[in-house]
C-alpha cells in the first residue's frame, strides 16, 4: 500500500478510536482533506469489522468510480479486488472485495433486499451535505437497522459544509473535525447579459479565460443538456491546441476516464 499524506491523515487514529467505542461518528472535513478515500482504507483492519465489508456511499456515479479507482491504485491493485464499486448498469466487485463504493439507489436496494445487511460492518455516508432524498432515506433505514437488528453496525457521516454539531446531536454521535488544504483563489465576476443565452455567455467566458490565464478551464453547468450545447459551440471557436471534453454521469467509462488522464504536452483542456 502506497503511503500518501492528506490533511485527514493526522485524524485517522482518532476516527478509529472513536469507532472502537461508539457505533456512530460525524466527521467534518473540507474538500481536499482526503476523507473519501482514506477513511475506508483506515478502517479495513479495525477489530470490530471482523472481516466484513465497508460500504462507502457517494451521491454521483463519477465520484463513486473515481474514488474506487484511487483507493485501488493506492493499494497497488485493480478495481474489483480489495476495493470495488457498484453503480447503475456497472458492477466492479468480486468475492475479495472489502470496500464497496456505491451510489444512493444501490444502498437503498441493498437495505430493502437484506435488512440485516449481513456481511457489512460499516456504512460511510460521504458528501452528506449534498442532501438528496435517497441519501436521507438511506441514513434513516440504516439507523433503523442499527437500532433494531444490528447494534454492531458502524455508521459514519462525513460532510464538508453541513452543521456537524447539530447533526452529531441528532445522531447522538461524537464529532471530529479535520483541516483541509488551502489554495490561493482569485474571484472575477463575468458580466451577464439578460438578452443573451446561457450557452453564448459561457462560451465568451471560456474564451476570455483561455486568453488571459494559463492552464486548463473547468466549467460547471446545470446539466447534460447545457453541457452538450456549450460543447457544440466551443468546438467551433477554440483553437486546435485546446481540447473540449464533457464530463457527466451518463458518459461511457472510457470517455470519463479521458478527462482524468493528463493532457498531451502543449495542449490545453476545457472540461464541461
Question: Over which residues does each language-model region extend?
Answer:
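P-loop NTPase motor module signature
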Residues: 1-272
Amino acid at each position: 500500500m502506497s503511503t500518501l499524506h492528506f490533511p485527514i491523515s493526522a485524524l485517522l487514529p482518532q476516527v478509529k478510536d472513536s469507532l472502537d467505542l461508539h457505533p456512530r461518528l460525524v466527521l467534518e472535513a473540507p474538500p481536499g482533506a482526503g476523507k473519501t478515500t482514506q477513511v475506508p482504507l483506515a478502517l479495513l483492519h479495525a477489530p470490530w469489522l471482523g472481516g466484513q465489508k465497508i460500504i462507502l456511499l457517494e451521491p454521483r456515479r463519477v465520484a463513486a468510480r473515481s474514488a474506487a479507482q484511487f483507493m485501488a491504485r493506492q493499494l497497488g491493485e485493480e478495481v474489483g479486488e480489495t476495493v470495488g464499486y457498484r453503480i447503475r448498469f456497472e458492477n466492479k466487485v468480486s468475492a475479495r472485495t472489502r470496500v464497496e463504493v456505491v451510489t444512493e439507489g444501490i444502498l437503498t436496494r441493498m437495505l430493502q433486499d437484506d435488512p440485516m445487511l449481513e456481511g457489512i460492518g460499516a456504512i460511510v455516508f460521504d458528501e452528506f451535505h449534498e442532501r438528496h432524498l435517497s441519501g436521507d432515506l438511506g441514513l434513516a433505514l440504516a439507523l433503523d437497522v442499527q437500532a433494531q437488528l444490528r447494534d454492531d453496525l458502524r455508521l459514519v457521516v462525513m460532510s464538508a459544509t453541513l452543521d456537524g454539531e447539530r447533526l452529531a446531536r441528532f445522531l447522538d454521535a461524537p464529532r471530529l473535525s479535520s483541516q483541509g488544504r488551502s489554495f490561493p483563489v482569485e474571484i472575477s465576476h463575468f458580466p451577464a447579459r439578460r438578452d443573451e443565452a446561457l450557452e453564448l455567455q459561457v462560451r465568451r467566458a471560456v474564451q476570455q479565460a483561455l486568453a488571459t490565464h494559463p492552464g486548463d478551464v473547468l466549467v460547471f453547468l446545470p446539466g447534460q443538456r447545457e453541457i452538450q450545447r456549450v460543447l457544440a459551440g466551443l468546438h467551433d471557436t477554440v483553437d486546435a491546441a485546446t481540447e473540449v471534453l464533457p464530463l457527466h454521469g451518463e458518459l461511457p467509462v472510457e470517455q470519463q476516464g479521458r478527462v482524468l488522464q493528463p493532457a498531451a504536452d502543449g495542449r490545453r483542456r476545457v472540461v464541461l
